[in-house]
Curated annotation (Swiss-Prot):
Domain of life: Bacteria
Known catalytic reactions: uridine(2552) in 23S rRNA + S-adenosyl-L-methionine = 2'-O-methyluridine(2552) in 23S rRNA + S-adenosyl-L-homocysteine + H(+)
Binding site for S-adenosyl-L-methionine: G63, W65, D83, D99, D124
Coiled-coil spans in chain: none
Enzyme Commission numbers on file: 2.1.1.166
UniProt record similarity statement: Belongs to the class I-like SAM-binding methyltransferase superfamily. RNA methyltransferase RlmE family.
Keyword Ion transport: no
Cellular compartments annotated: Cytoplasm
Domain (TRAM): residue spans on this chain: 191-209
Reported function: Specifically methylates the uridine in position 2552 of 23S rRNA at the 2'-O position of the ribose in the fully assembled 50S ribosomal subunit.
Protein name, entry field: Ribosomal RNA large subunit methyltransferase E
UniProt organism field: Haemophilus influenzae (strain 86-028NP)
Amino acid sequence: MGKKKRSASSSRWLNEHFSDQFVQKAHKQKLRSRAYFKIDEIQQTDKLFKQGMTVVDLGAAPGGWSQYVVSQIGGKGRVIACDILEMDPIVGVDFLQGDFRDENVLNALLERVGEAKVDVVMSDMAPNFSGMPSVDIPRAMYLVELALDMCKQVLASKGSFVVKVFQGEGFDEYLREIRSLFNVVKVRKPEASRGRSREVYIVATGYKG
């Protein structure tokens, strides 16, 4: 049997990935992923993270965001992270492997958070994409709705929420809901986010809960 050839789209993605300046920088600096630079740019603009904070990181693997946040909140801070994929340990991060859509996993995560409210909830969750927007966008919107539900359960008054959202059906309604719950809401497209991608980051501060 002959070798299977990669599709044009997967070959293009690989070429883009390995020539991406942020992928190269992440490799040189021994960072978990290029996502580190996305949250860094958001922090430079929006100043979300401070020493001693407690942060929930959803869709954490391979750990770029958690790695960055630990550097901002210091030894007295705490990150509680969750992902369906494995993640190598990071000092200062309490990691739970499991599917966030599973109620048992959600309950285990809430148990780790404990009684005290958290300062920031952040979500970089994304579904496995099929290439069909009619399938992918609803899957992605379901995940961001779950992330917002998490905010409603654990986020402290005046807390912050950062969430990756893919523009498409349901985006405007989701943005409206967030604006009803937070005092200040911005839509960011960090430089490290690929231009072709539909992803944007909603940064919401001043939770009214």
